[in-house]
């Protein structure tokens, strides 16, 4: 098992986005490196920079490594006057690369962070050295016009409309989901090996959910024009840098057979795919494998 980084409880507000202070972490090799690129780590929905505890120490042995808390998550602010969306987080990632890193960057993202990483990389062009998707969240155009029956579509539309307009029900779900016992249960469901589902991980998710404004971020998942962004197939057409797909093959959420087929159909030619014996968060469940695959892939380019 990789040795975890001792992530401080203190915040590092060294950079602002939309006039909000953003918590960031930067780690560099102890000895001066000749590497001309950097690595940026982007967490998923409800997570934070803490989720890279096993990755930052290893990757930063060779490369300059950055990790940021997306606006609305972790130690970053959770303003109530912001429209939370994939577009917002894509802009945050791209802006950080342009304003802070200022050199070609390998952007690594898990779940929602995977989508933000891909979308930002497609926009960054020459500042994108490559993209690593760890069970990324997002949709393809074909999925948005799927062949569901009329009844299925009607039930889905009714449920989404009812839930979207019912703040009381949303709040009830939110309060239930942020209980420690339920956070642990959810993590156990998406980690094939639960050895790393520890108090540190649970607290890293629960503490930010207690911040004022956290409920407004959670509500964004019910906004039909919110979290979902541009389809993957369109983003792949814009991407000019190499792509590494690191799949946790036992992910109950993202790694469906139909989804994998769509990746194979639309992913650019310069794509490598690796299937790992893990769940939705392979970087935290099997970090030694993820770290090695990332480093080997970068070295091979």
Model-assigned labels for residue ranges:
Residues 11, 15-20, 27-31, 66-108, ...:
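Active-site loop/oxyanion-hole signature of alpha/beta-hydrolase fold enzymes
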Residues 26-75:
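Conserved HGGG/HGGXW glycine-rich cap/lid loop of the alpha/beta-hydrolase fold
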Residues 47-57, 75-78, 116, 141-142, ...:
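Short N-terminal helix/helix-N-cap motif within the alpha/beta-hydrolase-1
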Residues 114-125, 131:
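Short glycine-enriched nucleophile-adjacent loop
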Residues 122, 131-171:
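Flexible "cap/lid" loop of the alpha/beta hydrolase fold
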Residues 170-237:
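Conserved alpha/beta-hydrolase catalytic His-Asp/Glu region
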Residues 238-278:
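Conserved loop-alpha-helix segment in the C-terminal half of the alpha/beta-hydrolase fold
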Residues 269-301:
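Catalytic active-site module of serine/aspartate enzymes centered on a nucleophile-bearing elbow/loop
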């Amino acid at each position: 098992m990789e040795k975890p980084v001792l992530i401080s409880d203190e915040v590092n507000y060294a950079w602002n986005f939309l006039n909000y202070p953003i918590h960031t972490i930067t780690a560099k090799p102890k000895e001066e490196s000749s590497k001309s690129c950097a690595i940026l780590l982007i967490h998923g929905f409800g997570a934070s920079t803490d989720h890279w505890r096993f990755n930052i120490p290893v990757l930063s042995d060779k490369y300059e490594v950055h990790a940021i808390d997306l606006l609305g998550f972790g130690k970053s602010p959770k303003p109530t006057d912001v429209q939370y969306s994939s577009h917002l987080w894509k802009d945050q990632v791209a802006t950080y690369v342009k304003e802070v890193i200022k050199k070609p960057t390998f952007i690594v993202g898990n779940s929602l962070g995977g989508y933000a990483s891909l979308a930002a990389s497609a926009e960054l062009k020459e500042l994108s050295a490559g993209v690593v998707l760890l069970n990324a969240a997002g949709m393809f155009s074909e999925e948005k016009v799927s062949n569901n029956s009329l009844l299925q579509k009607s039930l889905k539309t009714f449920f989404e409309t009812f839930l979207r307009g019912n703040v009381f029900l949303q709040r009830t779900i939110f309060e239930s989901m942020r209980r420690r016992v339920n956070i642990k249960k959810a993590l156990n469901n998406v980690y094939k090996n639960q050895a790393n589902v520890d108090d540190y991980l649970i607290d890293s998710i629960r503490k930010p959910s207690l911040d004022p404004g956290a409920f407004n971020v959670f509500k964004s998942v019910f906004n039909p024009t919110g979290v979902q962004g541009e389809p993957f197939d369109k983003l792949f057409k814009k991407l000019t840098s190499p792509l590494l797909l690191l799949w946790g093959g036992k992910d109950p959420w993202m790694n469906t057979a139909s989804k994998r087929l769509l990746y194979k159909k639309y992913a650019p030619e310069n794509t490598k795919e690796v299937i790992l014996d893990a769940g939705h968060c392979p970087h935290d469940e099997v970090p030694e494998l993820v770290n090695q695959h990332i480093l080997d892939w970068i070295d091979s380019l």
